[in-house]
């Protein structure tokens, strides 16, 4: 649904259909794959966390859960900061080297701060799944999708393509904040056990 609303909303902002699809394609088809490519390491790593957290949770090893959570989140934070800085600094070279188009660099620089939030959110979701909070992860993701659709529907016609970029930021920040809040709540609850 979201992918159908974006070009429609961009056209309502005054962009013609070809320009709206080109802009959307540059961000989702070119910039986002570069930003998300390093996340394959995080996804592989975080998928290994789910059974480990489940085992610790089932065995009531709550202090181990906290220690592993801190280590994993700090490592993810450091990795995502490095990736974010590299993509920001080398955005021109990456866009020319990969796509032979300099205009993609602008979107890489704009979206690079989101790397930290997106990568941490992936790890937090894996930790939550391991702590038997899969339903909470699903609820947050559904809420995030609905918020994203609302922002795209209402913001993009007013602000144009900038509204789409803003909606990406807001959506990712909301998802990260809700997931992080849920994880903190679970870790505090485990602290009392």
Tell me the role of every PLM-derived stretch.
Residues 132-135, 145-177, 185, 189:
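Membrane-interface helix-loop junctions in multi-pass transport and translocation proteins
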Residues 82-100:
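Short membrane-interface helical motifs at transmembrane helix boundaries
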Residues 24-31, 67-80:
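Junctions where cytoplasmic loops transition into the N-terminal start of transmembrane alpha-helices
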Residues 1-37, 95-97:
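Helix-terminus/linker motif at the lipid-water interface of multi-pass membrane proteins
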Residues 36-59:
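Helix-loop junctions and terminal segments of transmembrane helices
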Residues 115-140:
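Membrane-interface junctions at transmembrane-helix termini in multi-pass inner-membrane proteins
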Residues 100-124:
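Alpha-helical transmembrane segments of multi-pass membrane proteins
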Residues 2-6, 34, 49, 53, ...:
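Hydrophobic/aromatic residues within transmembrane alpha-helices of membrane transport systems
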């Amino acid at each position: 649904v979201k992918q159908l609303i974006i070009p429609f909303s961009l056209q309502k902002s005054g962009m013609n259909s070809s320009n709206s699809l080109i802009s959307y394609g540059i961000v989702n088809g070119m910039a986002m794959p570069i930003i998300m490519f390093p996340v394959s390491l995080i996804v592989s790593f975080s998928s290994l966390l789910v059974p480990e957290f489940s085992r610790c949770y089932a065995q009531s090893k709550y202090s181990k859960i906290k220690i592993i959570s801190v280590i994993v989140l700090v490592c993810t934070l450091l990795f995502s900061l490095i990736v974010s800085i590299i993509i920001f600094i080398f955005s021109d070279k990456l866009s020319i080297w990969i796509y032979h188009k300099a205009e993609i660099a602008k979107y890489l620089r704009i979206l690079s701060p989101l790397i930290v939030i997106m990568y941490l959110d992936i790890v937090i979701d894996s930790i939550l799944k391991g702590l038997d909070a899969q339903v909470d992860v699903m609820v947050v993701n559904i809420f995030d999708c609905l918020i994203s659709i609302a922002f795209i529907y209402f913001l993009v016609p007013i602000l144009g393509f900038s509204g789409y970029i803003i909606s990406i930021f807001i959506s990712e920040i909301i998802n990260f904040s809700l997931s992080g809040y849920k994880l903190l709540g679970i870790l505090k609850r485990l602290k009392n056990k």
